[in-house]
């Protein structure tokens, strides 16, 4: 999945743009759960599996929930 696809799924889960982190990373925040997650935003490049798992875990979602968004 690319960063754009991951961000779309996080938006569907209630995450909003919080702030720009260092370089090309974005902090996403969910006001309903109070959770934050960092997404590397490198256009056109797929996010590595381990990084994607960390984003999903930080978001408080299961892999199945995330993929169904």
PLM segments and residue spans:
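Intrinsically disordered, low-complexity segments enriched in glycine/proline and serine/threonine
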Residues: 8, 23-25, 68
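C-terminal structural segments of small proteins and small subunits
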Residues: 4, 43-69
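Polyanion-binding surface elements
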Residues: 1-14
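A short, structured beta-strand/loop element
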Residues: 17-50
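Short linear sequence motifs
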Residues: 8-10, 18, 59
């Amino acid at each position: 999945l690319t960063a754009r696809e991951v961000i779309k799924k996080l938006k569907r889960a209630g995450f909003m743009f919080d702030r720009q982190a260092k370089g090309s990373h974005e902090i996403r925040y969910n006001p309903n759960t109070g959770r934050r997650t960092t997404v590397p935003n490198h256009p056109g490049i797929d996010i590595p599996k381990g990084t994607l798992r960390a984003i999903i875990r930080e978001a408080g979602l299961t892999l199945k929930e995330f993929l169904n968004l």
